[in-house]
């Protein structure tokens, strides 16, 4: 717990939230690290994170442009409250502490997770266990819960053209997307001890 929870005064908040976002949204590391406060907003009274291609943000492929419901556990942990506070402070990015480098905004967070956090908790394997594995974990959880494969592809930004070709337009409502992502559950985690 001490290893995982950040010290608010030392710009460590991104280390806390990016891991949680990874296991509960499946977003790519740079997608999480570059997300803007304006990208987190409600649609039909449901909170979403919009992954967009713009002058300020980059996506891996066109398929990566999507919207991901904010998992109820993230809301319970205070993620939306944190974002609302940042909006009041006129912050542009959620993780404003991070600076863009050659490969995007994720370098600092990835180094911390891969070189400090994982070795500290005893699960480090060079080039094998990395922050990006949270995305794989999320996808595996969706499959284990028998979530429709097309919904999985929409949530994680895979093969968007395939989905649209078969269904046309935006086939799944915000309510359906929230219901399906809520099936991702980590029952062995003591969330109360992790809340900031």
Task: Identify the meaning behind each predicted range.
Residues 15, 45, 64, 125, ...:
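Exposed loop/turn and edge beta-strand positions of beta-sandwich/beta-sheet ligand-binding modules
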Residues 1-29, 33:
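Basic, Lys/Arg- and aromatic-enriched nucleic-acid-binding interface segment
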Residues 38-50, 69, 87-89, 112-113, ...:
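Active/binding-pocket-proximal capping segment
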Residues 156-190:
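Catalytic-site neighborhood detector that most strongly recognizes the C-terminal catalytic loop/helix
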Residues 34-77:
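Conserved tyrosine-mediated DNA breakage-rejoining catalytic core shared by Y-recombinases
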Residues 16-17, 47-49, 79-82, 131-134:
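Tryptophan-centric aromatic hotspots in well-structured domains and transmembrane helices
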Residues 72-111:
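Major-groove DNA-contacting interfaces characterized by cationic-aromatic clusters
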Residues 2-9, 25, 89-93, 101-102, ...:
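Short, basic (Lys/Arg/His-rich) helix/loop patches that form interaction surfaces
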């Amino acid at each position: 717990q001490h290893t995982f929870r950040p010290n608010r005064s030392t710009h460590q908040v991104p280390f806390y939230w990016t891991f949680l976002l990874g296991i509960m949204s499946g977003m790519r590391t740079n997608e999480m690290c570059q997300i803007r406060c304006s990208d987190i907003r409600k649609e039909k009274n449901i909170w979403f994170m919009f992954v967009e291609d713009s002058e300020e943000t980059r996506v891996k492929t066109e398929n990566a442009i999507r919207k991901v419901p904010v998992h109820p556990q993230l809301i319970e942990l205070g993620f939306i409250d944190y974002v609302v506070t940042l909006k009041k402070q006129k912050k542009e990015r959620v993780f404003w502490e991070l600076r863009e480098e050659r490969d995007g905004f994720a370098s600092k967070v990835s180094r911390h997770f891969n070189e400090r956090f994982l070795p500290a908790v005893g699960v480090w394997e060079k080039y094998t266990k990395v922050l990006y594995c949270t995305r794989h974990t999320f996808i595996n959880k969706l499959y284990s819960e028998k979530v429709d494969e097309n919904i999985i592809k929409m949530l994680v930004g895979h093969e968007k053209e395939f989905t649209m070709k078969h269904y046309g337009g935006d086939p799944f409502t915000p309510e359906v997307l929230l219901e399906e992502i809520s099936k991702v559950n980590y029952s062995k985690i003591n969330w109360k001890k992790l809340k900031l």
